[in-house]
Amino acid sequence: MSNMLKFGIPKGSLENATVELFKKSGWQVSISSRSYFPGIDDSEMTCKLIRPQEMGRYVERATIDAGIAGRDWVSENQSDVVEVCEMVYSKVSRRPARWVLVANGDSNVKGPEDLAGATIATELVGFTKRYFSERNIPVNVEFSWGATEAKVVDGLCDAIVEVTETGSTIKANGLRIVCELMESVPVLIANKASWADPWKREKIEQIATLLKSSLAAENMVGLKMNAPGDKVEAITSVLPSLKNATVSHLYNSDWLSIESVMSEKEVRRVIPELIKLGAEGIIEYPLNKII
Amino acid sequence: MSNMLKFGIPKGSLENATVELFKKSGWQVSISSRSYFPGIDDSEMTCKLIRPQEMGRYVERATIDAGIAGRDWVSENQSDVVEVCEMVYSKVSRRPARWVLVANGDSNVKGPEDLAGATIATELVGFTKRYFSERNIPVNVEFSWGATEAKVVDGLCDAIVEVTETGSTIKANGLRIVCELMESVPVLIANKASWADPWKREKIEQIATLLKSSLAAENMVGLKMNAPGDKVEAITSVLPSLKNATVSHLYNSDWLSIESVMSEKEVRRVIPELIKLGAEGIIEYPLNKII
Amino acid sequence: MSNMLKFGIPKGSLENATVELFKKSGWQVSISSRSYFPGIDDSEMTCKLIRPQEMGRYVERATIDAGIAGRDWVSENQSDVVEVCEMVYSKVSRRPARWVLVANGDSNVKGPEDLAGATIATELVGFTKRYFSERNIPVNVEFSWGATEAKVVDGLCDAIVEVTETGSTIKANGLRIVCELMESVPVLIANKASWADPWKREKIEQIATLLKSSLAAENMVGLKMNAPGDKVEAITSVLPSLKNATVSHLYNSDWLSIESVMSEKEVRRVIPELIKLGAEGIIEYPLNKII
Amino acid sequence: MSNMLKFGIPKGSLENATVELFKKSGWQVSISSRSYFPGIDDSEMTCKLIRPQEMGRYVERATIDAGIAGRDWVSENQSDVVEVCEMVYSKVSRRPARWVLVANGDSNVKGPEDLAGATIATELVGFTKRYFSERNIPVNVEFSWGATEAKVVDGLCDAIVEVTETGSTIKANGLRIVCELMESVPVLIANKASWADPWKREKIEQIATLLKSSLAAENMVGLKMNAPGDKVEAITSVLPSLKNATVSHLYNSDWLSIESVMSEKEVRRVIPELIKLGAEGIIEYPLNKII
Amino acid sequence: MSNMLKFGIPKGSLENATVELFKKSGWQVSISSRSYFPGIDDSEMTCKLIRPQEMGRYVERATIDAGIAGRDWVSENQSDVVEVCEMVYSKVSRRPARWVLVANGDSNVKGPEDLAGATIATELVGFTKRYFSERNIPVNVEFSWGATEAKVVDGLCDAIVEVTETGSTIKANGLRIVCELMESVPVLIANKASWADPWKREKIEQIATLLKSSLAAENMVGLKMNAPGDKVEAITSVLPSLKNATVSHLYNSDWLSIESVMSEKEVRRVIPELIKLGAEGIIEYPLNKII
Amino acid sequence: MSNMLKFGIPKGSLENATVELFKKSGWQVSISSRSYFPGIDDSEMTCKLIRPQEMGRYVERATIDAGIAGRDWVSENQSDVVEVCEMVYSKVSRRPARWVLVANGDSNVKGPEDLAGATIATELVGFTKRYFSERNIPVNVEFSWGATEAKVVDGLCDAIVEVTETGSTIKANGLRIVCELMESVPVLIANKASWADPWKREKIEQIATLLKSSLAAENMVGLKMNAPGDKVEAITSVLPSLKNATVSHLYNSDWLSIESVMSEKEVRRVIPELIKLGAEGIIEYPLNKII
C-alpha cells in the first residue's frame, strides 16, 4: 500500500516506554489485551507488536517498514537493515543494557579465557559463539529458555551470558560479573527498500525527529525569572549553555524577563546562584519536547 | 439554603473522569470508600454521587441543583430540566457512547424491520419502545438487569439495544451491530428554578466555563520558539489558526519569540516545517486550561 | 567523610511524599524492595530510610547529618538537634497531623480532667505523661503496639492518645475526640555539628530551598493572556498580589502579554473576571517550582 | 431436544457458592471469563448463567427447564413455576437474606405506618408496593439502580427496602432497620411442562437429591473410635441421635469400633465426654455428602 | 553423591500442579521467590526447577537423575533417556496438551499439504520440520519467541504450530485449527545410568508409585453405607467394579456395613439407586490416594 | 459475667493460623475488616484481637480470661499468668521462632562477649538487657520500631536481636547470625483467677484439648486396606506404632480390613512395603482431628 507505513513496537521490556514515548510525541498508541493489533491515531501508519528478537527479521523481510528494538538483537540476527538512529531512553532507570559474562560468586573465573571447555548458557547464542571464537576459546554455547541466572546458580552450566542494567539481580543471586561483552541501546531500524522510497523515508524521519525531541525533554525543565537590566549578563552566564536564554523587555520597566531550558540536576545548582544574583519571580515549568 | 449549590457527580463509568476534570478545573473532589458524600473544597458547593440513570429525576425534583449525566439517560426519563451545555470528554478513548441494535453474528437481521414480533432486551426500555413504535414495528421490549450481551448469545432474546464505544466487546462475543439508534454525550443539566435564581445560575456558569476550559486543553500543548525577524510571517502562517500566535521582541536582538497553542496532532505536522523555516530553540510545554 | 551529607528519609506515611518531593526538586531517590539503602543521584549525598520515631535519635547522635520527621516524634524523644525549617506538605490531603485524646462515643469524658485514675494507651508515652502531669491529673499511661483505636473500642483501656488527619477513622469506629493535645508538621532537622560545618550547612540550605520551592508550587499554576494596552491596569488589579505580573510588549501591536502565578483556587475566581475585562488567549500551565 | 436438561445458574452473589455446590455434588461447572456459556461435564445437561431477577421469567417461558434463584425474585416477578425445594446454603455466613425497611438512624420512623406519603427507593418495586398497599399506607415507591443505601443517607428518599444478611453495612452507614419485611432463601424452581416430563423430572430430582446431600454435609464430620465392649452403650448414648452409630467387632479382641456422623459444633461437646468414657483412638474425618 | 536423588520439577505451566501432586504424595516442596532452589523434606532428594524444554537435556547429561516434563519437549530434543511412566494429571482442566497446525480463520488451508512453500512459526522447530519433511511438503519453519498466535493474526507468517488444551484461545483470536499434529502428556523420565543404579531406581519407583496413587485418587471418593443383610448382593452389584466393596458385620445386628471407592461422576448415578435399594446412613468422604 | 469466657486471639503473624485452628476445632471465628471484634459461634465465649506483645498484660489484668501468644512476649513482660500448654503449630513452615543475635556479615563478632560497649537494637528490650547483664557484658540496648535488620545493615547500631524462622531474610541482607538467644513457641495462657474458677477452667481445658487434637492431625492421614488373614501380623508390624491399627473381619471371607493413622511422611515409606506384603485396596484419607 502506498503512503502507509508499517511500524514495529517492541513487545516486552521496552513496550510501555515506547508507547509512552509515542504519546509524548503526539501519537496515541492503544494496546488492548483483547487484540494483538495496537491502534494508532495516524491514518498513514499501522503498528504491530513484535518481539525484539524478531524485529530485525521482519524489517529485513519488509513485513514491516521500520521498528524499534535493541541493537543486541538486531546484530544477533545479522539482519540486513538500515539503522536510522539510536533512541536513548534517558531516564535514570534506563541505562544502556549490558550483556555480561557471569559466573558463580565463589568460582575462580577471572576472564573469558578461564572458560575453555566450559558450557555457557545464553539467549544470545550467535553473538556468544562469535565472541569466544574470535578469541580462540573453545566453549559449548547452548540456548537458554529463560531463568538463565538460575542455571549457573544451580550448576546446570559453568557460566552465562546475560543482559542486565544495574547488576543487582546478579548480585542478589550470589553471582559475579566476570566482564562486560557488549552494550546495547534501542535503535530505530528501517527496511532498505522503504528507506529508498521518498514518502516512507520522510515519514520515518518525522517519527525519528519527534521521538528524539521527546527523549531530549526528559528530565529537562524550563526556568523563567525577572531580573534588573544590569544583572542580565551575570545571570545568563550562570545558566547552562545548552541553548541561549530568551531575554525580553518588560513593559514600562527596565527589568527583563529571562527564560531558559536546563536539566533538573542543573536547576539544583543554578537556583541558589540566581537568588544571590538578584533574580526574582523564579518559576520552573515542565517541558514535553525540545527540538 | 441560599448561596449553596448542590451538584450531582455521575456514579460509574464517568465518575473518575469527572473527578479528574473538576481537579483540572481547580476543585478537589474527594470520594471516599467509607462515605457516600464526596467532599469538595468550595464552601459554596456540596456534591452527591448519583447514578446517571437517576440524575434527571433528582435534578428535575430539585433534590440537586445541577449535575452531569449522559444525554441518553436524561432523555430516557424525559426529565424536565435545562441542558446547560455538552461536556465532550475529548480524549481518544472517550468517543461518544452509541446505543446500537445488536443481533447474533449469524442471524439474518438486516434492519429494525426484520425484528417484528421479536423480544428485545435492553436497559433503555422507554427509548427502545418509542423507537420501534415510531416505525410501527411491533416488538416485545423487556428490561435487562445487566450482562445484556449474554442474553442474545444465550438465546434468551432475539436482539438487544446496548451501549458501546468501540464495538469491540460486541464483536468479541460473536455478535453484530445491526444499526446505530442514538449517540449520546455527557451533558450538564440544571433544575429550572435553580437556573432562574441569579446566584445559582452564575455559579453553574462558572463551573461550566472552567470545566470546558479544561476539556479544551486536553491533547493541546503550547509551542514556543525563537526566529529571525524576517521569518516571522512565514512561521506564523504554518501555525494552526486556532488562536493568534503571541509574538514578542527579544532583548538586544532582531530575533523574535513566537508562542502558540495547538493540538498534539498538529505538532506532528508543524515541527518538521518549523525546522525548515529556521525556527530555533523550539520547546513544547503542557497546558491545563484554554479559555 | 568530608563533603558528603548523610540524609534521613522518613520511613512510612511520609515516605512516598518525601521521595516525590525530592523528585520535584531535582533529585531522583530510588527505594528498592531488595535493598534498605535508597539511592540518590547526587555524589555529595547518601540517604537512609529511618522511622520518624527514631529520626531525632540518629540526627542527634550524628549517625546522619540531617533528616525529615514529624515534630511530634522529634519532641517526644527530646532530641537535641537544630530545626532548620518546617516542610508543610500542602496538598489538601496533607493537613497537619493532630494528636488527639479519644474516648468511647458514649462515655462521659468531657475533658482530660475526667480521666483521673484512668488507663491511657498511646504510642507517644513521654508526651502524654508530661501533658497530664503538667495538669496534675494522675493517669496510667501505657505503650500501645499499634491498633490503638481498637483498644478503647474493646475496653482494654479508658482512653487513647492517637494521631489523626481528618478524624474519620475515629468516627467510623464509634469513638469521639475529647480534645486536641498537639498539632504536628514535618520538620527538617540537622545535627548541631553538621550545622556548624560551612559546607554541610550550605548543602542543607540548598536542599531546604529547593524542597520549599517545590512545596510552594503545589496547587499553583501559571496563567498567561493577551490584552489591549488600555486594559492592562484593570486586569493586573484582579490578579492575586502574590507576585507581580510579568507584562511584555507584543510585536507590531499595542497589545501586551500578561503572565502571573496563582493558586488553582484563585483561578476559579479570576477567569470569569478576566473574560469580562477583555483578556484573550488565556492559557493555564502547570508549575514545578516557585522560588 | 429430548433427554437434555437446560439449567440456570444464578449470576452474582450465589454464583460461586452454586458452582462449588455442584462440584461437591459431582458436577464440574466451568465458568470462563471469555465465554458466557458455563460448561458442565454431564452430556444430559447444559447450563446458562442468569441473573436471579430474571430466573423466574426464563423458567416460566421454558427458555430453561430449571434453575436456582432467591425466592424473593421468583415471587417479585410472580412467575408461574414449580418450586421443587429450598436450597439452604447452610454455612455460617449464609444466613437467609432479609429484605428490611431502612430509615436514617436519627429519623422518627418507628414502623411502616410512619411512612405515609413518603418516597421509598428499592430494587423490589412490586413486592414493596404490594406490602404497603395491603396495609393501606400510601407511599411513592421508585426503582433504585443500586447503591440504595446511599439514597437514604443522601436524603434522596425517605426510606429504602433493601436486602441484608447481617445488617452490618446498614449500621456502618448510620442507618437503622425499621422492620423486616420478608426472609428469602434460594429455591430450585422448574418449568411446569418440564416437571410433567418424566425424564426431565427424574433428572431434576437427581440434581436436587445430590445438591441437598452436599448441603447436609456442610459443617458435618465423621467421628470414629475404638471402645471396650462394656462401654459401647454409654458411648453411643452421648452421640447425637441424628443417625445411628455404626458399631463393628474388632479382630481377635472384645473391643468394638464405633463410627458416627455429627456437626462440628457437637464434636466440641462430645469429645471431652468420650475421653472420660474410655474411648480410644478417636479420629475425626471430613465428609462430602450425607444422604 | 550416593543415596541422593536429584529431581527436576518442571518450571511453568506444570509447576504448581507438580508441587501440589508431591504434597498429596507426602513431600513438601517449597518454592521461594527468593531462591532458585526448591526445598524438599526428604533427606535423600534434592530438587531443581527446570524448564520443560530443557528437562531432557539435563536428564540425559546426568545433571539430574530424573524429572517430569511434557513428552513433546523430551522428543523435540531427542534426548536419550528412560521414560519411566506417564503422569496423567487427570483433573478436568488437564486434558492432554495438543500441538495443532493453525491458520487464519478465513484462509483456504484445509490440510498440511496446502502449506507447500509457506512460512510456519513455532516453538517446536525440530518436530515441525520432521513432520513436514516426512510428508514431502517443503516449508520454511522458523523459531517463534512466544506470542505465536499473534504472528498468524498479524500476517507475520502463514501458519503456526502451537500447543493448546481446549482450543479456546485460538478461536478467540479468529484462528482455525487445521489439524492436530501430536498429543502430549507429562512423563517421568530418568537418566540411563541412574536407572541402572539399584538404589536410585528403587527411589524413582517409590516416587512414581506415590505420585500415581495421588493422581488415581483425583475426583475419586469413598462411599460408605449400612444395609440389611438380604440387600447386600443387590447393592454391591450396582457399585462400580473398580475395586471390590469392603463389607463387614455390624455389632448385634444382621445389618452390614458396605464401603467402596468410585469416581464423583459415578456417585451421581449410584446414589439414587442405593436409596431405592434400601441403603441407609450413606456418607461420602474424600480420598488422598488410591493404590 | 459468669459462664462467659473472654479469649484473646493473637493479632499479626499467628492470626490466620489461629483462626484456621479454631475452625478445624469446631469454632467459626470471623474477623471483619469493618470491626475490631472477632465473632465466634459459641454463646459461652467472646473474642478479642490482641497484639502478642500485649497479651500477657491483658491476661494478667483479667481484661481477658485466656489467650494465645508467643512465649517470648509473655516472658518479656514477665506477666504473672498460668501457662496452660504449648500450642506447637506443626506445619513445616511453622518452625519455632528463634530470637537470634545478628551482626554484619563481615564483622568480627564471634559471640556476645565481643559486643561489650556496643549498641544493640531490638524489640525485645527487657529480655536482651537481662541476657547481657547475666553475662556481665555492658551494652547499650535500645528499642527498635521495626525494620530492625535495616539498622545493622545501615550502621545505625552494632548488632540486633531479632526473631527469625529460617534465617533466610537475615542472610539475604548480608547479615550473619552470631548465636541463638531463645526459642519461642506459642502458648495458651490463662488468668490466675479464671483458672481457679471451675467453670472457666473446664472451658479453657475443652478449648486446649480440641485445639491440640487439630494440631495433632496436621500432616496425619488415615490408611485403610484389605488383607488375607495370614498377612495381618506382617502388615500391622510395618505400620507405625503411634496407635494400634483397627482390624475387623470382612463379610463372608477370611480377609480382614486394617485401618491405621500415620504421618504423610511415613506413608511414603510404608506403601511400597504394604504392596509387597499383599495388601489390597489401599486407600488414604484425610483427618481433621486425632485425640
UniProtKB/Swiss-Prot annotation, chains A, B, C, D, E, F:
One of its GO terms (molecular function) is ATP binding. GO terms for biological process: L-histidine biosynthetic process. Pfam families: HisG, HisG_C. InterPro entries: ATP-PRT_HisG_long, ATP_PRibTrfase_cat, ATP_PRibTrfase_HisG, HisG_C, N-reg_PII-like_a/b, N-reg_PII/ATP_PRibTrfase_C. Its cofactor is Mg(2+). GO terms for cellular component: cytoplasm. Transmembrane segments: none annotated. It comes from the Bacteria. Its EC number is 2.4.2.17. It is an enzyme of class 2 (transferase). It catalyses: 1-(5-phospho-beta-D-ribosyl)-ATP + diphosphate = 5-phospho-alpha-D-ribose 1-diphosphate + ATP. Pathway: Amino-acid biosynthesis; L-histidine biosynthesis; L-histidine from 5-phospho-alpha-D-ribose 1-diphosphate: step 1/9. SUPFAM superfamilies: GlnB-like, Periplasmic binding protein-like II. Catalyzes the condensation of ATP and 5-phosphoribose 1-diphosphate to form N'-(5'-phosphoribosyl)-ATP (PR-ATP). Has a crucial role in the pathway because the rate of histidine biosynthesis seems to be controlled primarily by regulation of HisG enzymatic activity. This is ATP phosphoribosyltransferase. The gene is hisG.
